[in-house]
Amino acid sequence: MEQRISLITLGVADLRRAAAFYERVIGWKAESSPPGVVFFALNGVVFGLWPHDELAKDMGTTSDGVSAYRGYALAHNVRSEAEVDAIFGRLKEHGATILKQPQKAFWGGYSGYFSDPDGHTWEIAYNPFWTIQQDGRVSMKKE
């Protein structure tokens, strides 16, 4: 298996609301998608939104028992602490729950956590040891 992730799909309660959240708050643009799912192209990785029940059915399970803590966090790295703060400034008015306000992190960066309207946990982070290329790709080396 090659070392990459091609698609990350989140189960959501309200597809229209979830798509609007990622478009308005995060600033992503949805791609042309089949009915009932929304895709965003993110520099080689596709990010998808699909209703909980449909995703569970596709996985051969049910969507019962979705808990608040799911044992993961998705992360979006930005180019400055100010950019972290700007994103957090928009979150609450669009249905996000702030889990941890942005602050200096033990690893030398600056980050905060929120959950989107469907409870998916996100970290918005500035890592001074990584470089974000012009096209948005992240390099784990400072250039």
Ranges and model annotations:
Residues 24-30, 96-97, 120, 124:
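Conserved acetyl-CoA-binding loop of GNAT-fold acetyltransferases
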Residues 54, 106-107, 128-131:
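A short acidic/small-residue loop/turn micro-motif
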